[in-house]
Amino acid sequence: MSEIVDIYAREILDSRGNPTLEVDVFLESGAFGRAAVPSGASTGEREALELRDGDMARYLGKGVLKAVDNVNNEIADELIGMDADDQVAIDNKMLELDGTEFKSKLGANATLGVSLAVAKAAADEAGLSLHKYIGGAGARELPLPMMNILNGGAHADNNVDIQEFMIMPAGARCFAEALRMGAEIFHALKSVLKGKGYNTSVGDEGGFAPNLKSNEEALQVIMEAIVKAGYKPGEDVLLALDVASSELFKDGIYTLENEQQKQKTAAQLIDFYEDLVNRYPIISIEDGMAENDWDGWKLLTDRLGKRIQIVGDDLFVTNPRILKEGIQKGIANSILVKLNQIGTLTETLEAIEMAKRAGYTTVISHRSGETEDTTLADLAVAVNAGQIKTGSLCRTDRVAKYNQLLRIEEELDDCALFRGHDVFYNLKK
């Protein structure tokens, strides 16, 4: 009864007004799954290919009708008749059909849409929530959220170099409380920014995007907002950064336009981070070095990897092969997991399992171009990731994930776990 009888893709819009892919999967029993695919702004060089049409007469070349056609024809022809509950076989069939390292034939947006829609259809067939279907009886840990409340870099039209300044309400007793704390700090930050005469428009991920005097001023206004909301920095709330350093790196030098010393070597940039970590309750730095600066990554990990979470995003691109090399070389201590970087659920789960076996933490993440799809909320609980990064406390495309986590926590009731500070299990206390 779990046999796939139809697969259908369509072109829809993401949160930035760009086309993306949505896929429906129908089973013989009448069970149904639907998934929409996200899209990134700052992307790693080794990410699986997001197939776009390139036809400038439609959506400025960003249409996805080629990917839609690949799903409705080539992929559907191969998968119709297969069992939806055999996720590995289905994903492997698509990998075989594509035959390229980065899914450049079918497009990772095509394969991911199908992969996730199949999982949702199988969950519907089994009468299970998606997190229970993927993770089984042990899926019960609600993630500590990384809330991106101030944006810079490629996520905003301002003069701030660092792409994301995030809060982590680690002192909360449950996810619902963490969400409330984050929302209160978000509104306090708006008040702080207004009081200083700054613009309170928001960026792609719902965080404020003011023109500030320096990158450090972003930390200062967030600290002020935490206190204004009635919380203690370092106890109730921790800070996290996504530097997106690949965007700042050229010819072996990092350029931060908003700093007095604009150009920095890898060692000087690490000195800059260490100084911030010493003065602010920063627990996590993502993409602190450029994706191809592996020597810089090693220096950063050796210097700060026992004290804070060093997260690889563009570095690892959710790719088990690249992650394995990083583990062997002692680079980073955490992986950011983005489903569309690799393009199938099976490969995503493989990367998560590999990271956990190596003692790396895992952070399940959205992209800057999102939809109302809430799959990543279920995935975070399914794999007991412990952390999720899904934007600020406004914009429905971000809040949809938080609201889904509230529902999951309610469903799990007394079985739900929320670890707070303890999610950083690989750091020295």
UniProtKB/Swiss-Prot annotation:
PROSITE patterns cross-referenced by the UniProt entry: ENOLASE
Per the Swiss-Prot or TrEMBL record, the active site comprises E205, K338
Amino-acid positions noted as binding (2R)-2-phosphoglycerate in the UniProt annotation, renumbered to this chain = Q163, K338, R367, S368, K389
Cofactor(s) the protein requires to work: Mg(2+)
Q: Can you quote the record's cofactor note?
A: Binds a second Mg(2+) ion via substrate during catalysis.
Task: Report the leader peptide range.
Answer: none
NCBIfam families according to UniProt: eno
In terms of HAMAP family, this protein maps to: Enolase (MF_00318)
Query: So what does this one do?
Result: Catalyzes the reversible conversion of 2-phosphoglycerate (2-PG) into phosphoenolpyruvate (PEP). It is essential for the degradation of carbohydrates via glycolysis.
Task: Give the record's family classification.
Answer: Belongs to the enolase family.
Does the keyword field hold Metal-binding?
yes
Q: In which pathway does it act?
A: Carbohydrate degradation; glycolysis; pyruvate from D-glyceraldehyde 3-phosphate: step 4/5
Per its record, the protein catalyses: (2R)-2-phosphoglycerate = phosphoenolpyruvate + H2O
Q: Where in the cell is it found?
A: Cytoplasm; Secreted; Cell surface
Which residues hold Mg(2+)? D242, E286, D313
The organism encoding this protein is Pelobacter propionicus (strain DSM 2379 / NBRC 103807 / OttBd1)
Give the UniProt keywords, A-Z.
Cytoplasm, Glycolysis, Lyase, Magnesium, Metal-binding, Secreted
Entries under InterPro entries matching the protein:
Enolase (IPR000941), Enolase-like_C_sf (IPR036849), Enolase-like_N (IPR029017), Enolase_C (IPR020810), Enolase_CS (IPR020809), Enolase_N (IPR020811)
Q: Which GO annotations describe the biological process of this protein? A: glycolytic process
Main site of residence?
A: cytoplasm
- Presence of keyword Transferase: no
- State what protein this is by name: Enolase
In short, the EC number is 4.2.1.11
